[in-house]
């Protein structure tokens, strides 16, 4: 097997660049460049000398002997000065060693998986942790890296295997006196309880998608109610055209924000009204579709001249807000909140209300939830097999046990305990090269 190397510390130039190595030739390479093998897991400061005798850099080197390393192989890290020329010269030197090459994307993590240092849930959590941009995404990723999810899935799989063992005992030893009669009848209640736990876990995972993918907030209302002004004030810059002419927003305008630690996808839509303009009609249809898919609809009214708006059916929470408070400074209880997007009057209260909504939605997510669609899909497949074993009482007992075996395999594929070779390239290609 090759020894692999890569920059693991990010973009250059930087104050420090970390070069990671892993593989069977690490000891030889470290001894050659450092002139010695540093004490395991201790930082060693010294000059790095190329094999032609030229000076490479003064650096910190740390050696991690197998199996006590990230990959489970011999590993080393070189902490160099982060100049591009310094790093490129060092990488060139590493490439001159026989059997040493630059790592592919995610190859360090893949080796960690192959050596049993990570399971697939932890590997996916690690990828999500690296990509996390918000506190909610970080929290969701940590659920995966902690190992608690893996423990849960393996516990559920063990329970299914135990149930199958009881059933097969009845099938194989039904004539033996020391095997209780119809022992399998006594364990189907446990299977039902497990199925209930899986269904709730799936529901939690679907709710948790907002932490990873973000909340969809749609600004809707009649033309000239101030929707684009709200969009611009939330963005802190001009991103939507604001004019006195009605119907200027004809396509949905989307923007990404972070509110209350959650990623938000904010959409400004065409004004709802009857029109003969074909292009504007198309824009209104697009607006209706965004409303149907939203988590929150901010239905904006001009409080000086409010116009009725009929929204399409949606499961979203709907706020009826009054805009243009600067022109009509009276408190009207028919609005969820009143403000002026133009002047900013009371707009800070509107933002606090939005942040509170985000916090509330984030708090609905449990502490242990599946973070990936792959995990959710396999959980759903497992539930389907368990339901088949529970619902079809007329099936031969051996066939019901087979459904439980298939459910157990689906749970095993989540963690990688069951062969998932065909998925590894897809999963680890999401990592950066140095991970």
UniProtKB/Swiss-Prot annotation:
Enzyme class: hydrolase
Subcellular location as annotated: Cytoplasm
Domain TrmE-type G: residue ranges: 214-359
Cellular component annotations (GO), alphabetically ordered: cytoplasm
Enzyme Commission (EC) number: 3.6.-.-
GO biological process per UniProt: tRNA methylation; tRNA wobble uridine modification
CDD domains according to UniProt: trmE, TrmE_N
Residues the entry annotates as binding GTP: 224-229, 243-249, 268-271
Sample GO molecular function, one term: GTP binding
Xref: PROSITE patterns: G_TRME
Swiss-Prot/TrEMBL cofactor(s): K(+)
Co-factor: note: Binds 1 potassium ion per subunit.
Keywords: Cytoplasm, GTP-binding, Hydrolase, Magnesium, Metal-binding, Nucleotide-binding, Potassium, tRNA processing
Gene3D superfamilies to which the protein is assigned, alphabetical: P-loop containing nucleotide triphosphate hydrolases, Probable tRNA modification gtpase trme, domain 1, tRNA modification GTPase MnmE domain 2
Domain of life: Bacteria
Residue numbers binding Mg(2+): 228, 249
Residues reported to bind (6S)-5-formyl-5,6,7,8-tetrahydrofolate: 20, 77, 117, 435
Subunit structure: Homodimer. Heterotetramer of two MnmE and two MnmG subunits.
Function: Exhibits a very high intrinsic GTPase hydrolysis rate. Involved in the addition of a carboxymethylaminomethyl (cmnm) group at the wobble position (U34) of certain tRNAs, forming tRNA-cmnm(5)s(2)U34.
Family affiliation: Belongs to the TRAFAC class TrmE-Era-EngA-EngB-Septin-like GTPase superfamily. TrmE GTPase family.
HAMAP family: GTPase_MnmE (MF_00379)
Protein name: tRNA modification GTPase MnmE
Gene name of the encoded protein: mnmE
């Amino acid at each position: 097997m090759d020894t692999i190397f890569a920059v693991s510390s990010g973009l250059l130039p930087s104050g420090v660049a970390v070069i990671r190595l892993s593989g069977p030739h690490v000891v030889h390479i470290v001894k050659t460049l450092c002139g010695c093998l540093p004490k395991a897991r201790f930082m060693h400061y010294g000059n790095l000398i190329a094999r032609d005798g030229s000076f490479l850099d003064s650096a910190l080197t740390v050696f991690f002997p197998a199996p006590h390393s990230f990959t489970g192989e011999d590993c080393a890290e070189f902490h160099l000065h982060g100049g591009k020329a310094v790093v490129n010269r060092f990488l060139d030197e590493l490439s001159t060693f026989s059997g040493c090459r630059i790592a592919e994307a995610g190859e360090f993590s893949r080796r960690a998986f192959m050596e049993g240092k990570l399971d697939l849930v932890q590997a996916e959590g690690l990828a999500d942790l690296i990509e996390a941009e918000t506190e909610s995404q970080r929290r969701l990723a940590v659920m995966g890296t902690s190992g608690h999810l893996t423990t849960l899935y393996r516990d559920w799989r063990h329970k299914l295997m135990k149930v199958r063992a009881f059933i097969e005992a009845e099938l194989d030893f039904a004539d033996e006196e020391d095997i209780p009669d119809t022992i399998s009848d006594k364990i189907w209640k446990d299977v039902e309880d497990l199925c209930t736990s899986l269904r709730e876990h799936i529901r939690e995972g679907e709710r948790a998608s907002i932490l990873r993918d973000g909340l969809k907030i749609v600004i809707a209302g009649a033309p000239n109610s101030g929707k684009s002004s709200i969009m611009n004030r939330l963005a802190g810059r001009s991103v939507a055209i604001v004019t006195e002419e009605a119907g200027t927003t004809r396509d949905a305008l989307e923007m990404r924000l972070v509110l209350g630690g959650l990623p938000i996808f904010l959409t400004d839509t065409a004004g709802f009204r009857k029109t003969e303009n074909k292009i504007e009609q198309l824009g209104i249809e697009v607006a209706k579709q965004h409303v149907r898919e939203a988590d929150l609809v901010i239905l904006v009214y001009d409080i000086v001249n409010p116009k009725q708006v009929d929204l399409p059916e949606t499961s979203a929470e709907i706020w009826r807000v009054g805009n243009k408070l600067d022109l009509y400074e009276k408190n009207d209880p028919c609005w969820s909140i009143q403000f002026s997007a133009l002047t900013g009057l009371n707009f800070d209260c509107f933002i606090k209300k939005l942040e509170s909504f985000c916090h509330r939605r984030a708090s609905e997510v449990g502490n242990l939830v599946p973070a990936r669609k792959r995990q959710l899909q396999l959980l759903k497949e497992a539930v389907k097999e368990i339901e088949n074993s529970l619902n079809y009482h007329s099936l031969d007992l051996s066939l019901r046990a087979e459904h439980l075996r298939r459910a157990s395999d689906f749970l095993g594929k989540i963690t990688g305990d069951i062969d998932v070779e065909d998925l590894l390239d897809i999963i680890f290609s999401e990592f950066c090269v140095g991970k």
